[in-house]
Amino acid sequence: MPELIRPSTILPANRSLISIKTSDGLNLIGEVATPLGEITGSLLMLHPNPSGGGMMDSHIYKKAANRLPAMAGIQIIRFNTRGTQSEMGKSEGEYDHGKSERLDVLAAVEYCFERLKTNNLYVIGWSFGTELALQYARDKRIKELILLSPPMLSTTDEDLDFWIKDGRQITALIPELDDYLRPDAANSKFSKVKNLKQIDVVGAKHLWVGEPMVHLVLSEIVKIIAPSRLPLPQEI
């Protein structure tokens, strides 16, 4: 008899611990979850702010790694930025408020292309991770950006100007009840970024708590990377 997908559900994938070396000599811990079959695309995940408990195991990211390789053929790459700790361990270095984390993002992107030989790489940021994505995930080989709950606290107009000129697609999921940037403010902030698709999510909050919100976020990810795999199952 089929069972409902639950927060604890872990579907089959090849999972391996990784160590990413930064240009300033730090080792960052992470995990790659690779589909057992065809890879439809790869997704590098930039986590929320570690000063508020953000890490590679933040719930949306862990559930994506537990489900999307099997459900959608998506390879998931997660890692802890410098000084960040999760169940798998702690990355070397110290949290630097998004400054030295630039080197972490650059190293992780390079790891995807050089070590994993990624062909179709997408980058997702959540909260603090959206700032890292918009500021540092600019490698021309990256296909698109996905933003969850972007607070837009440190991303500048100059950063947005880069993406306006660059033209690559950006998708931003904006919670109706966000703590930092709600839909109307996001519309204003992103008004000049014509290549940004804003999706306003009724009833959502900054942390996307609850299985309905998890399913929605994962479905939007799959719609971008592997649309033929929709709809995502809600039971197995």
Predicted features by range, described:
Residues 1-41:
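N-terminal cap/lid segment of alpha/beta-hydrolase-fold proteins
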Residues 26-116:
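Serine-hydrolase catalytic machinery in alpha/beta-hydrolase-like enzymes
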Residues 124-133:
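Gly/Ala-rich beta-loop-alpha elbow adjacent to hydrolase catalytic centers
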Residues 153-154, 176-181, 206-207:
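Acidic catalytic loop of the alpha/beta-hydrolase fold
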Residues 158-160, 181-191, 213:
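Short alpha-helix in the alpha/beta-hydrolase fold that links the catalytic acid
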Residues 166-167, 172-174, 178:
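Short beta-strand/loop motif that positions the catalytic acidic residue
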Residues 191-207:
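Catalytic histidine neighborhood in serine/cysteine hydrolases
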Residues 204-216:
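Catalytic histidine-centered segment of alpha/beta-hydrolase-like enzymes
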